[in-house]
């Protein structure tokens, strides 16, 4: 009875982990950035460029926001324009844009982004493999498959933990937003970029928790089956 309960909750937590990881992987809201520029004589109107990016795409669109309005709601699906500019995020991670930068900082950014992308792909492969192993383990009550699936869930959790850490380091240090701001201020005296973590980013830690928990439960299940069968 206890074994069946452990398998049930392991499968539930594993399914939640897979769902959260796949949504975080496929959505383009790891980073939300707003660029506020006042280049005209109007003081109450702000011309804002909104950026959002994920694993596959980086998109941006322009908007006008009245003073004291919150910019964050512009990223909601229904508030976005029908047409917006998008490019592959791998070659143009914010705040860099392919073709506008021919410097070592851009090359370093692309390489860093490459490591981040590889870790995320490995995490997705690990969590999908774990699910497949657990599905195969259920009919045969195989302790080896349960242990392998549990280990794969834990590996996926560790890989996505590294993904989150690398992204935090990217936003806080590697992106060099201060240099980007100074470069933009050559054309506009008042320019202030603002960067926030998006909802895709926050899905990853939740997926990490459920994936690690599922992995531990399936390792316990595999150990129990090995001893008692």
UniProtKB/Swiss-Prot annotation:
The keyword Membrane applies. The chain crosses the membrane at residues 115-135, 151-171, 201-221. Keywords: Cell membrane, Glycoprotein, Membrane, Myogenesis, Signal, Transmembrane, Transmembrane helix. The keyword Coiled coil does not apply. Residues 49-59 are annotated as: Interaction with ITGB1. It comes from the Eukaryota. One of its GO terms (biological process) is myotube cell development involved in skeletal muscle regeneration. GO terms for cellular component: plasma membrane. It is a multi-pass membrane protein. Residues 136-150, 222-229 are cytoplasmic. Residues 1-26 form the signal peptide. It is found in: Cell membrane. Residues 27-114, 172-200 are extracellular. Interacts with ITGB1. Negatively regulates myogenesis and skeletal muscle regeneration via its association with ITGB1. Modulates ITGB1 activation by decreasing ITGB1-LAMB1 interaction and inhibiting ITGB1-mediated intracellular signaling during myogenesis. PANTHER family: TRANSMEMBRANE PROTEIN 182 (PTHR32012:SF0), TRANSMEMBRANE PROTEIN 182-RELATED (PTHR32012). Belongs to the TMEM182 family. This is Transmembrane protein 182. It comes from Bos taurus. The lineage of its organism: Eukaryota, Metazoa, Chordata, Craniata, Vertebrata.
